[in-house]
Amino acid sequence: MMISAQACGANGRMKDYHYTGPVEHKFSPYAFNGGTVLAVAGEDFALVASDTRLSEGYSIHSRDSPKCYKLTDTTVIGCSGFHGDCLTLTKIIEARLKMYKHSNNKSMTSGAIAAMLSTILYGRRFFPYYVYNIIGGLDEEGRGAVYSFDPVGSYQRDTYKAGGSASAMLQPLLDNQIGFKNMENVEQVPLSQEKAVQLVKDVFISAAERDVYTGDALKICIITKEGIREEIVPLRKD
């Protein structure tokens, strides 16, 4: 073992380092793996979209890792943050949904899934899952619904929501194009499914130009009463 000269005193012995206080040992179980998720609710449909890049720092671990997970025939969840927690959380949700279906002989509604997820996250509030969740689906009346969460369980129903590394770029665009925020003398026409899909493609293409953690491909889950349809759109890969 090589010992530097600075570590030895004048007598050739190792220096004795004394600490003036307690030594704090660092424990950092989390990592940020990037990625962006987005959900939009319409009159009779909902969209949940995400990019497929899984990265950490300047390294790309995978170019084919979507962050949209199908829960039921009318509900999809988008998760971004620490990928390990995303996988663990979605497995817990899927297990709870199977137990519910076996007990009640029916699938859980989107609103009930959102309430259940809130209790799961709050139960881990002292050691939370590092995951930002957005649920998109149809409610009991067949209308589109979006539920957004923070990591410890607070949630609310929205018409549109973006989360993840590029959310600060996507949310203002959604506010302008869907919410018509701070706009005067503008006719607020209902959002059609075709326009919503095109808007999602446009905002992700713009985000991939500016956010290094977003890119490779875009996966869009289109939820209607007929079921869930998926579209894949290529994004820039650098």
UniProtKB/Swiss-Prot annotation:
Name of encoding gene: psmb1-A
PANTHER family in alphabetical order: METALLOPROTEASE TLDD, PROTEASOME SUBUNIT BETA TYPE-1
Quaternary organization: The 26S proteasome consists of a 20S proteasome core and two 19S regulatory subunits. The 20S proteasome core is composed of 28 subunits that are arranged in four stacked rings, resulting in a barrel-shaped structure. The two end rings are each formed by seven alpha subunits, and the two central rings are each formed by seven beta subunits. The catalytic chamber with the active sites is on the inside of the barrel.
Entry similarity comment: Belongs to the peptidase T1B family.
Family annotation (PROSITE patterns): PROTEASOME_BETA_1, PROTEASOME_BETA_2
This protein's UniProt keywords: Cytoplasm, Nucleus, Proteasome
Cellular component, GO annotation: cytoplasm; nucleus; proteasome core complex; proteasome core complex, beta-subunit complex
Protein source organism: Carassius auratus
Pfam family, one: Proteasome
Name of the protein in question: Proteasome subunit beta type-1-A
Superkingdom of the organism of origin: Eukaryota
Annotated GO biological process: proteolysis involved in protein catabolic process
Cell compartments where the protein resides: Cytoplasm; Nucleus
Keyword Cytoplasm found: yes
Function text: Non-catalytic component of the proteasome, a multicatalytic proteinase complex which is characterized by its ability to cleave peptides with Arg, Phe, Tyr, Leu, and Glu adjacent to the leaving group at neutral or slightly basic pH. The proteasome has an ATP-dependent proteolytic activity.
Main location, first listed in the record: cytoplasm
